[in-house]
Amino acid sequence: MVSMQNDRIRIKLKAYDYRILDKAVAEIVDTARNTGAGVAGPIPLPTDIHKVTVNRSVHVDKKSREQFEMRVHKRLLDIMEPTQQTVDALGKLSLPAGVDVEIKL
């Protein structure tokens, strides 16, 4: 048993594409459940939207603008009462490229 003050692992995932994010979450949930740990989540967190407005032309026509946006999708997972087998399996897990993972014990 992983000896911590609170017996949970909190995993926060971020990605620009929600489809690969959901695949990564599904892999983590399957791995945790197969090793005997309980899983709370995935909890969808608010999406960060970064908007950038630029002029279409260089020096003229200020009314003609274009907007671009970048969305960062986030999910939160809690793995309750993880065993050593769970920690080892999560360490060996290969997630898709483009998924940022933060782990708090």
Curated annotation (Swiss-Prot):
GO molecular function: structural constituent of ribosome; tRNA binding
Domain of life: Bacteria
Keyword set, alphabetical order: Ribonucleoprotein, Ribosomal protein
Gene Ontology process terms (BP): translation
Pfam families attached to this UniProt entry: Ribosomal_S10 (PF00338)
UniProt keyword annotation of Disulfide bond present: no
CC annotations in GO: ribonucleoprotein complex; ribosome
Assembly information from the UniProt record: Part of the 30S ribosomal subunit.
NCBIfam families, sorted: PRK00596.1, rpsJ_bact
Function of the molecule: Involved in the binding of tRNA to the ribosomes.
Family statement: Belongs to the universal ribosomal protein uS10 family.
HAMAP family for the chain: Ribosomal_uS10 (MF_00508)
Protein name listed in UniProt: Small ribosomal subunit protein uS10
Gene for this chain: rpsJ
